[in-house]
Amino acid sequence: MPDPRLTTLPAPARARLLARFGPAVDAWCEALPEQVAELAERWGVEPLAAGGGGTSRVFRCRRRVDERAVWLKVTPDPQVAAEEAEALAGWERTASVAGLLAADPGAGALLLDGVEPGTPVRGQEWEPAQVAALLRELRESGPDQAPGEGSALRPLAHRVGLLFGLALRRAGPDGPDAEIRLRRARAQALELAASAPGAGLVHGDLHAANVLRGPGGRLVAIDPRPAWGDPDFDAVDWALEGVSTPEALRERTALLAGLVPGLDADRVHAWAHALGALLAAPAARAGHDDARTRFLLGLGG
């Protein structure tokens, strides 16, 4: 039986889930320790540490059969689990995405292979060539066919709508200017999603915090919020990472396009303009007025 102090949700984690899913998630939070105990027994793992974001709770575990480090991920939304499980299965041919060991989407549960050393790229220097290798792997190793009947994956337009919907809901004291800016940016993003010349499996949340350093320095993607649509979408965070001028954005998109076959520099640039206000929204709500925040807010025109 896992230590209840480990599996009981602390107040900040519970607050994030409430903000994302609403009061209906309370019952799930209360039942989490019992659910984790059942999953740990079923999958033969021992939870050692806990963490998580706004949609799930994750537990670093030791697999009893071989002492291997694995991760148990549990979400109150079965759709989120089903989407991630399908995407990870779709990328099973590549070592550049965390491996799926077991899944129970109906219970919102996934068991994921560990990544060693597993250091997040966020806050570290990164090489464009390494990021390009990751983007190439995601584009080339995913499914060749569009999702069929019964697939959990939804079009990229749905992901875009969800992201902007959450941002608009959180705009709050930013007032009408923020809402107008976000609605204009959402229209641009939806137009891009609809006009993609080709479609593939999209990670959907490929920022530096969701990329780890794996064996031999290989970059490994984790925590997809996947969709089916324009694969250029996944390059946007890397095109904008550390960038605060139009010239630097042009240079970065051209550099990535030169390293990733099929990546369209003009479309990545357009995605950056459409998503800049979305990426800047948290900093703007916090009252930041630095050069990068102003640059991102200004991308939408």
Language-model features: where?
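Active-site acidic catalytic loop and adjacent metal/ATP-binding pocket
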Residues: 48-64, 100, 187-233
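An alpha-helical support segment within catalytic cores of ATP-dependent transferases
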Residues: 27-36, 143-203, 214-215, 257
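ATP/Mg2+ or Mg2+-diphosphate-binding catalytic cores
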Residues: 251, 279-301
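A conserved alpha-helical element in kinase catalytic cores
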Residues: 30-33, 55-57, 66-111, 115-138, ...
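Juxta-kinase regulatory segment immediately upstream of eukaryotic protein kinase catalytic domains
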Residues: 1-48
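Active-site Asp-x-Gly
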Residues: 213-258, 265
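Conserved, surface-exposed functional patches that form binding/active-site neighborhoods
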Residues: 130-150, 231
